[in-house]
From Swiss-Prot:
It comes from Staphylococcus epidermidis (strain ATCC 35984 / DSM 28319 / BCRC 17069 / CCUG 31568 / BM 3577 / RP62A). Belongs to the lyase 1 family. Adenylosuccinate lyase subfamily. InterPro entries: AdenyloSucc_lyase_C (IPR019468), Fumarase/histidase_N (IPR024083), Fumarate_lyase_CS (IPR020557), Fumarate_lyase_fam (IPR000362), Fumarate_lyase_N (IPR022761), L-Aspartase-like (IPR008948), Pur_lyase (IPR004769). Transmembrane segments: none annotated. The keyword Lyase applies. This is Adenylosuccinate lyase. Catalyzes two reactions in de novo purine nucleotide biosynthesis. Catalyzes the breakdown of 5-aminoimidazole- (N-succinylocarboxamide) ribotide (SAICAR or 2-[5-amino-1-(5-phospho-beta-D-ribosyl)imidazole-4-carboxamido]succinate) to 5-aminoimidazole-4-carboxamide ribotide (AICAR or 5-amino-1-(5-phospho-beta-D-ribosyl)imidazole-4-carboxamide) and fumarate, and of adenylosuccinate (ADS or N(6)-(1,2-dicarboxyethyl)-AMP) to adenosine monophosphate (AMP) and fumarate. Gene3D superfamilies: Fumarase/aspartase (C-terminal domain), Fumarase/aspartase (Central domain), Fumarase/aspartase (N-terminal domain). The gene is purB.
Length: 431
């Protein structure tokens, strides 16, 4: 991922240095496991643990000759050791090291992403509670429907991200898995105890069955889950963008002193952060195809997935980490214009209370079709003449003979739409 959309904490996980360090840790743990089984002298393992070092530049230099990165790596590490170097990579095949180490690196990335998710969820919870009773216009098909609250909108986002966190924790169990089962997965030259020891010490699980590789359905599920998280954020970001439109202006991204919105128009204050999240989500989601196409490898192994994953996995995790942090700050610092929310409710002449009038007539004994046919023409007239809906209702004796003035007051009271907000918050775990 380009530096512009990267944070150092996550980017450092995907460096060659960290990748080689992960390979080395797998190699050393394998030696320790062999030693536990009595194959490698403990003194040799001690020397390997103390003296084996990674030199990325030297490994790449060797790779120019070997044309094989793992062979180059093991030879470079061996240069830092004495006679004990013969035990490095003992009984292993390249992907025993590469796939297991990759899962370990992904685990490191996941620990950051999980913290990101938890922080975002906390910010959403705080926003939901702050604006629990702040009435605003609910819109369906982009058109005014009935009042909701900004807190309910935030509660919706909160529960969606809670589901995303749950899914993320589940996919961690699938992706944080190692394998050290040899060239075709049969443990022909390495006992399962080695795999168990290494994976336990790395804090990852073991694959019940593998070939030379871990199966890439795991990685596809992982990328799809991260893409779903990104897409939820995009949905929220698009909502902010729509609510920041000049003619709506119910919320606005924080605008810093000295910030510029346009090179040509000094007045501009644009939702560029939310637009950024929208674009990054598209990039992340685009990798779903790559991840799925990596699943059908040939027989017990090919490396068609390798080049794709070297690009895909860093890009997706780095981009999602960046997006989660940026969007958390956007939501946390979001300006909410409560007066504009109320003014927008009043823009449609009270039409948003049409269902309340309809239900009141039904409750008084009128059949639904008759009630609907009485209310709808008044609503259409209100739209077309810009006349307050209640005024037109009160001019129709067939309605006022059924509904008293007090009953109409109740129909047109926006606070009615707050009646179940506490229930919604309790169900969301926000009470």
């Amino acid at each position: 991922m380009i530096e512009r959309y990267s944070r150092d904490e996550m980017s450092s996980i995907w460096t060659d240095q960290n990748r080689y360090e992960a390979w080395l840790e797998v190699e050393i743990l394998a030696c320790e496991a062999w030693s536990e089984l009595g194959y490698i002298p403990k003194e040799d393992v001690k020397k390997i643990r103390e003296n084996a070092k990674v030199n990325v530049e030297r490994a790449k230099e060797i790779e120019q000759e070997t044309r094989h990165d793992v062979v180059a790596f093991t030879r470079q590490v061996s240069e830092t050791l004495g006679d004990e170097r013969k035990w490095v990579h003992y009984g292993l095949t390249s992907t025993d090291v590469v796939d297991t180490a990759l899962s370990y690196v992904i685990k490191q990335a996941n620990e950051i992403l999980e913290k990101d998710l938890e922080r975002f969820i906390d910010v959403l919870a705080a926003k939901a509670k702050k604006y629990q009773y702040t009435l605003m216009m609910g819109r369906t098909h982009g058109v005014h429907a009935e009042p909701t609250t900004f807190g309910v909108k935030m509660a919706l986002w909160y529960t969606e991200m809670k589901r995303n966190l749950k899914r993320f924790k589940e996919v961690r169990k699938e992706i944080e898995v190692g394998k050290m089962s040899g060239a075709v997965g049969t443990f022909a030259n390495i006992p399962p105890e080695i795999e168990a020891y290494v994976c336990e010490h790395l804090g990852i699980d073991t694959a019940a069955v593998s070939t030379q590789t871990l199966q890439r359905d795991r990685h596809a599920y992982y990328i799809a889950t991260l893409a779903l998280i990104a897409t939820s954020m995009e949905k929220f970001a698009v909502e902010i963008r729509n609510l920041q439109k000049t003619e709506t202006r119910e919320v606005e991204e924080a605008f810093a002193k000295g910030q510029k919105g346009s090179s040509a128009m000094p007045h501009k204050r644009n939702p560029i952060g939310s637009e950024n999240i929208t674009g990054i989500s598209r990039v992340i989601r685009g990798y779903i195809t790559t991840a799925y196409e990596n699943i059908p490898l040939w027989h017990e192994r090919d490396i068609s997935h390798s080049s794709a994953e070297r690009i895909m996995l860093p890009d997706v995790t780095i981009a999602l980490d960046y997006a989660l942090n940026r969007f958390t700050n956007i939501v946390d610092r979001l300006t909410v214009y409560e007066d504009n929310m109320r003014n927008n409710i009043d823009k449609t002449y009270g039409l948003i209370f049409s269902q309340r009038v309809l239900l009141a007539l039904i409750n008084k004994g009128m059949v639904r079709e008759e009630a609907y046919d009485k209310v709808q023409p008044k609503a259409m007239e209100s739209w077309e003449t810009k006349t307050p809906f209640r005024e037109l209702i009160e001019q129709d004796s067939s309605i006022t003979d059924v509904l008293s003035s007090e009953e109409l007051d109740d129909c047109f009271d926006p606070k009615h739409h707050l009646n179940q907000v506490d229930t919604i918050f309790a169900r969301a775990g926000l009470s």
